[in-house]
Amino acid sequence: MTSLLITGYKSFELGVFKDKDPKVNIIKKAIKRDLKRFLDEGVDWMIFTGNLGFEFWALEVAKELQKDYPLRLATLFPFETHGQNWSEANQEKLAAFKQVDFVKYSFPAYQSPAQFKQFNQFLIDNTDQAYLFYEPENETNLKYFYNMIIAASDYPLFRLTFDDLNEVMSE
């Protein structure tokens, strides 16, 4: 079994506020290209944490790829209460994260910032590699997870970058 953790920018961090935004198609095209490569290299589990934006788009692509690949999907939420205050439209996306092969949460509810560090460490310790849409120059809260991955020198990290998206756009 080879697992791939998938995470990255949230939609609002990319200035995407509608599902029909043209940026989403370009991002999904890049995701599909990359996920196929991971699948061809033997990845058979893709792990998500239930975030809107890059993760949700990757989940949509992964569900499409399940038709052609022996792929299993999992969502590991940081909290049981994850997404409970989201809008109705986003509740549908949350439901998609729950309609996978394996679903668990780490903590019943948020109590302290230390839980995020523990959750991130758990993800690194229990997955084989990560696929991350993040650039340190465009900093978000994802920087904490990114820095933990970098510190774990034996944990493979594959990044999608804005340059990659420009390449896909010009194809």
UniProtKB/Swiss-Prot annotation:
Superkingdom in the source lineage: Bacteria
Family matches, as InterPro entries: YspA
Family, similarity comment: Belongs to the UPF0398 family.
HAMAP family referenced in this protein's UniProt entry, alphabetically: UPF0398
Protein name (record): UPF0398 protein STER_0279
Organism: Streptococcus thermophilus (strain ATCC BAA-491 / LMD-9)
Lineage: Bacteria, Bacillati, Bacillota, Bacilli, Lactobacillales
